[in-house]
Amino acid sequence: MQGFIKFIFTFFTTASVFCSNLLFPATVYPESENFDFSYLEYPEEAIITLEEAGLTEQELVGRASAELPEYVQSGGYDDINGITISPYYTARVSGEEIPVYASVVFIRVDDTGTLHSFSEIYVDSTEEFSFNIEITGADVELKNAVVLPESHGVEALCKDNTVTASINKTGVYTFLFNNANQYYGYTLMVREKVDEDKEIAEYIDKYGEDNVWVLDKGVYQYDYVNLVAHNNLVIYLREGAYVLANHLYDINCVEDEDKYLEPTALGDNAIGLTRYPFINFYNCNNITLMGRGVIDMTRLDRRERRGVVFTNCNNVNVSDVKIINSPEWSFISYCCTDVSIDNVDIIGNRGNCDGFAICNSHNVTVDNCFARVADDTFEVKALGGTMDSKNITFTNCIAWGGYARCFGITGEVNKKISDITFRDSAVIYRDGIWDNDRIGSLVVVAEQTEGSIDGVLFENIEIFRDEGRPVLVKIYDEEAENFEIKNVVFRNISYTSYMKPKIAGTDSDTNTVQVELDGIATRGKKRSFPKMLFTIGKHCDVTSE
């Protein structure tokens, strides 16, 4: 049945994209006079083409194939970095060619890899602007295109192997080509132009030169970076700063994960890690990690290290950086308070390279971020520890899930989780269906149930395509007793999916699952009786507006 439904939706997508492009071609608007912009460009010594690396596209993306042994598929390599020149496209903004980069990502539905292409430009948003981007196929013949999220209201015109779209505001724009094929995605990040010299000078005036560490454009290699008990510290990665993690330990099987210990690591983090994260902050206050640089962990083996980790920290600000191909959990906030994350992008193809994991933290905002990873993308957890998870808000974020879940409460609920918001965000694709009682696009899934969940809002979220469940609320631990999931609200949610959304408790009537549905739309049409769209299990209180 699911295969038939998928066929129908695939046919519907193909037909609608084709007809829309044929019958209602997009309008290309006049550009602003003297439109001024700059673009992200990485140093030549960091970025090489596939040809220069002696690789074909198939050889590179084949490294992510699930047909390989797990620790080979997610292993590291050093013959090419995690960002390369995209072989798929060239791009122009206002007639000027801009770099198109690419990183390996994972497609779960086919258990294989592909390249996700991207560019980034900087504009002055204090002035009205309009520009046209032209994307021309190189290895890919372009026949039609759709621009996501649909809420941007941007349409694409395809003619003679070139796609053109008019853009007039900052944001993250993802182009799907050839009947919304997820193999050849391209994302344009349009972000605010900044004066790096001015920003750095202001930080030096505020904190002193010794407390402002600047990495200029260039390549930097570290075994790991360990920062303990720092206060009022700024780490500034200028545009084009390329930070590489050195591979030290061969992790070829699960036994190897515990084979290599770094003796002082356990005392320098609060999460129980026996090897340092690649960038580790512990017991720090008023910390800023920012700039248009990249943190690339492609050389590390599976689970050799975690990515960027903050534990027991206060007043944390992270902005503008890109995190590439972490071997495990890309970004972690654990037992932290007052955390701001803005304009951070995470791309990765390995299993367990979760995107943004906010754990046991208070007063956290995640805004304007993009993640395409082979695991959970934007998640809240409550692990063991003294703190619960409270007052955490995600806004204007874009998720592309190549394996598991996109937005929500995922797995560990060992303390109370409360006052969580996911708003004004979008799912491009989510294609994992390996356990449809555990994964989905928007989820509240409790696998460990020592705590409780009270107050989760999903609002104004669009899901372009989900191969499984678009919404899942589930007590996954069937042995749970006296566990509460309450005050969960789904408001103004639109989706297209191959399975029904689901809300389910357990056989025990001691557990509570309470959900409100308010404004649910499928395939672009708001439904009058949203409860009828859902599979609803035992001991669930579901209301609808």
Model-derived features: positions:
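Hydrophobic core
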Residues: 13-21, 235
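Beta-strand-enriched, solvent-exposed domains that form extended recognition/catalytic surfaces
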Residues: 33-202
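Right-handed parallel beta-helix
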Residues: 232-234, 239, 285-296, 314-325, ...
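Extracellular beta-rich repeat passengers
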Residues: 413, 432-545
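Extracellular beta-strand-rich solenoid/capping regions of secreted or surface-exposed proteins
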Residues: 165-167, 220-234, 244-288, 298-315, ...
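Short glycine/acidic-rich loop motifs that flank beta-strands on beta-rich extracellular proteins
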Residues: 223-226, 245-248, 298-306, 327-333, ...
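Sec-dependent signal peptide cleavage junction
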Residues: 18-31
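Acidic Gly/Asp/Thr-rich repetitive segments characteristic of extracellular carbohydrate-active
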Residues: 192-234, 244
